[in-house]
A protein has these predicted regions:
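N-terminal accessory/interface modules of nucleic-acid-binding and processing proteins
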Residues: 1-316
């Protein structure tokens, strides 16, 4: 089994702990405090102010969407081509070893309290709220291209996929169906009809209707991409955190296109064009760029969640 196959099989160790809601909230607050005081993390956040840095983060997010935002920024800053990351111990559990000359990627992770600290707490008879919970630290992880197999690894069986035009057409039909279903769930109707002029789609806030161009020269793949973009704009307006951001036309366009970029990649329909951040965006502080990225992550996550369940069968 290759490193990619091992990770895709659901065997990737996570750098982030699973916990209840109260612990997650505490963990988030602690992460924000630690990240604000850490030079490497701040460099990674500041990189979002440039078009190149923003694009690097979008590519990393498409591969590591389940990792927290701060860790996505760190990976994009240190190794933007990373696709699957795990600790050295994690890779060994999968049958791989990290090569000796490889530099680690530093990411935030919760390190559990030592056994001795927990034993001391028990012996002292201290109350539950004083139980040692561990610490938040920058820990080393490695990408899949930094490891080699331990011993002989069997070659994965290559599945034969039928080459037929109908397969691609069926995927597009399924994608459009999932998008239309999601739109109806948030109170938005979708209509396809010819549109005169250069505009290929639009959203009418007063009626809650999205209209997508159905002209013969606007193929189904382009219609799906435009529908994702229009839905992104709807969700941007609905997002509670959006009110804390002053989105001018340039900033809003970048956020919407970034969402469409991420969701398109999730649906297997990547976008080739680069996304250029506005001049004013680049002049703002890294904390503002962080809030833009968080908005993209939230909105894209909603659309990706709606699509994944319906598209998993098509991607197998």
């Amino acid at each position: 089994m290759s490193a990619v196959k091992a990770v895709q099989a659901g065997q990737r160790p996570s750098a982030m702990p699973s916990s209840n809601g109260r612990c997650r909230s505490k963990y988030k607050r602690e992460l924000l405090e630690r990240a604000a005081a850490d030079g490497l993390t701040q460099e990674a956040v500041e990189a979002l102010r440039s078009s190149d840095g923003w694009q690097r983060w979008l590519r990393v997010r498409c591969q590591l969407a389940t990792h927290g935002l701060h860790n996505q920024f760190l990976v994009a800053h240190q190794r933007p081509g990373a696709r699957h990351v795990a600790s050295q111990q994690g890779w060994r559990s999968l049958g791989y070893e990290v090569r000796s000359d490889e530099a680690p990627i530093r990411v935030w992770a919760h390190v559990p309290a030592s056994k001795s600290a927990v034993c001391d707490w028990r012996r002292a008879g201290s109350p539950p709220e004083e139980k040692p919970e561990g610490d938040l630290r920058l820990v080393p992880v490695f990408d899949q291209d930094q490891v080699s197999p331990l011993g002989e690894v069997p070659k994965p069986v290559q599945k034969k996929h039928p080459r037929s035009g109908s397969s691609e057409a069926n995927k597009l039909i399924r994608l459009l169906g999932q998008l239309i279903k999601f739109a109806s769930e948030i109170g938005v109707s979708v209509n396809f009809e010819p549109i005169a002029g250069v505009v290929r789609g639009y959203h009418e806030p007063g009626t809650g209707e999205i209209v997508i161009d159905a002209s013969p020269d606007f193929p189904p793949a382009a219609r799906a991409a435009r529908l994702i973009y229009e839905l992104a704009n709807v969700l941007i307006d609905e997002d509670p955190g959006r009110r804390r951001l002053k989105l001018c036309n340039g900033e809003r366009e970048v956020v919407a296109r970034s969402v469409a970029w991420c969701v398109g990649a999730c649906a297997g329909r990547g976008y080739a064009e680069a996304i250029v951040v506005p001049t004013q965006w680049a002049a703002d502080s890294g904390s503002v760029a962080f809030r833009y990225a968080a908005l993209v992550d939230r909105v894209a996550g909603r659309l990706e969640g709606a699509l994944l369940s319906g598209l998993e069968g098509e991607q197998e």
